[in-house]
């Protein structure tokens, strides 16, 4: 049986935002902010007619549009986080889902989104891409 090739493309973007964590005891229950770094990983088995998985620029633009919704905002006030904590985990999930909607039907898929709230702390969401 022939092995299937797997290609992976990754882009990084950033945004700045404030938040606080509800139902949490510790420093993060108070209003504070981060300069977030977001890593988006896209995977696919097939290159297009240009022999690329997708154009980096197209992925960067799609990610930019999503993080623009979060940039310089108080995340708790956004509809996506009204009933859900704007934790690193939930921010990664939000960005993953928005990008997955954007690229639905393509020959590749969003594999993961990682939200870094500091150089040493991050959370990754894989959605349905694992298994």
Where are these regions (language model features)?
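Charge-rich, low-complexity N-terminal segments
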Residues: 1-131
């Amino acid at each position: 049986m022939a092995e299937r090739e797997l290609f992976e493309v990754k882009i990084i973007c950033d945004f700045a935002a404030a938040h606080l964590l509800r139902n949490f005891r510790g420093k993060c229950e108070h209003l504070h902010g981060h300069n977030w770094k977001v890593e988006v990983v896209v995977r696919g088995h097939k290159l297009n007619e240009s022999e690329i998985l997708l154009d980096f620029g197209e992925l960067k633009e799609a990610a930019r549009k999503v993080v623009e919704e979060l940039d310089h905002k108080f995340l708790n006030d956004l509809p996506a986080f009204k009933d859900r904590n704007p934790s690193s985990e939930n921010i990664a999930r939000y960005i993953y889902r928005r990008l997955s909607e954007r690229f639905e039907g393509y020959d590749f898929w969003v594999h993961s989104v990682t939200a870094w709230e500091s150089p040493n702390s991050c959370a990754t969401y894989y959605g349905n891409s694992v298994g």
